[in-house]
Amino acid sequence: MSRLGLPEEPVRNSLLDDAKARLRKYDIGGKYSHLPYNKYSVLLPLVAKEGKLHLLFTVRSEKLRRAPGEVCFPGGKRDPTDMDDAATALREAQEEVGLRPHQVEVVCCLVPCLIDTDTLITPFVGLIDHNFQAQPNPAEVKDVFLVPLAYFLHPQVHDQHYVTRLGHRFINHIFEYTNPEDGVTYQIKGMTANLAVLVAFIILEKKPTFEVQFNLNDVLASSEELFLKVHKKATSRL
């Protein structure tokens, strides 16, 4: 039974159905997949558990040269054999945590992120089963954990700072979350944190307790507007 006293399965289905309906309003498909950048994709795995929606995160292995020990979503660079950007995200999720493509229902592709003048990261939100047991690849992943989606709107520990990149000011959120299962505290920041905030707002439709990058009244248009401005600046430097 759920905390509401209702059977778990109907509660999960209701949560996921509502999430899908809201996310699909923000699906841009392959609108920007033609842009000439180095292509990366990430998967934001969404799971309904104990009457709440959660996001699944990984902690990068300390053995990795780039960003060791940082919290992120499963993802990586596109391979020539990947059919599209979504295939990249699914392949990387399988390699990193053992999540097979048939275990994911990809719901939407969000507005991509430009992290420098030549690297485009495309985020996908996918639903996964509440019974999924992660199998971290120790060469790439140190740990896997879940965070309630609502935490990214009303956190216990949050900070933010501003950075200027490609001629535009960006908000970088920094969250600290202590996993109640083992007491481990994780820091979630940068693009990963920003995407978590965006997805939480889209699905839960509640105002966050802090400033955000996007316009709360027109999330999609404001996200695309900023992306296109940064894209224009990036291409002018090539």
Curated annotation (Swiss-Prot):
Broad EC category: hydrolase
EC number: 3.6.1.-, 3.6.1.77
Catalytic activity annotation: hexanoyl-CoA + H2O = hexanoyl-4'-phosphopantetheine + adenosine 3',5'-bisphosphate + 2 H(+); octanoyl-CoA + H2O = S-octanoyl-4'-phosphopantetheine + adenosine 3',5'-bisphosphate + 2 H(+); butanoyl-CoA + H2O = S-butanoyl-4'-phosphopantetheine + adenosine 3',5'-bisphosphate + 2 H(+); decanoyl-CoA + H2O = decanoyl-4'-phosphopantetheine + adenosine 3',5'-bisphosphate + 2 H(+)
Pfam families in the cross-refs: NUDIX
Domain (Nudix hydrolase) ranges: 37-172
Motif (Nudix box): 77-98
Span(s) of short sequence motif Microbody targeting signal: 236-238
Cofactor needs: Mn(2+); Mg(2+)
Record's subcellular location: Peroxisome
Notes on activation and inhibition: Inhibited by fluoride.
GO MF, one example: manganese ion binding
Binding site for Mg(2+): 92, 96
Tissues expressing the protein: Expressed in liver, kidney, pancreas, pituitary, small intestine, spleen, heart and placenta. Weakly expressed in brain.
Modification N6-succinyllysine, positions: 20
A single cellular component GO annotation: peroxisomal matrix
Listed PROSITE patterns: NUDIX, NUDIX_COA
Annotated site residues (Important for coenzyme A binding) in this chain: 66
Disulfide bridge map: none
Keywords: Hydrolase, Magnesium, Manganese, Metal-binding, Peroxisome, RNA-binding
GO BP terms in the entry: acetyl-CoA catabolic process; brown fat cell differentiation; butyryl-CoA catabolic process; coenzyme A catabolic process; malonyl-CoA catabolic process; medium-chain fatty-acyl-CoA catabolic process; nucleoside diphosphate metabolic process; propionyl-CoA catabolic process
Coiled-coil blocks: none
Stated role: Fatty acyl-coenzyme A (CoA) diphosphatase that hydrolyzes fatty acyl-CoA to yield acyl-4'-phosphopantetheine and adenosine 3',5'-bisphosphate. Cleaves CoA, CoA esters and oxidized CoA with similar efficiencies. Preferentially hydrolyzes medium-chain acyl-CoAs and bile acid-CoAs. Has no activity toward NDP-sugars, CDP-alcohols, (deoxy)nucleoside 5'-triphosphates, nucleoside 5'-di or monophosphates, diadenosine polyphosphates, NAD, NADH, NADP, NADPH or thymidine-5'-monophospho-p-nitrophenyl ester.
Quaternary state and interactors: Monomer.
PANTHER family: NUDIX HYDROLASE, PEROXISOMAL COENZYME A DIPHOSPHATASE NUDT7
Similarity comment: Belongs to the Nudix hydrolase family. PCD1 subfamily.
Protein name (record): Peroxisomal coenzyme A diphosphatase NUDT7
Species per Swiss-Prot/TrEMBL record: Homo sapiens
Lineage: Eukaryota, Metazoa, Chordata, Craniata, Vertebrata
Name of the gene: NUDT7
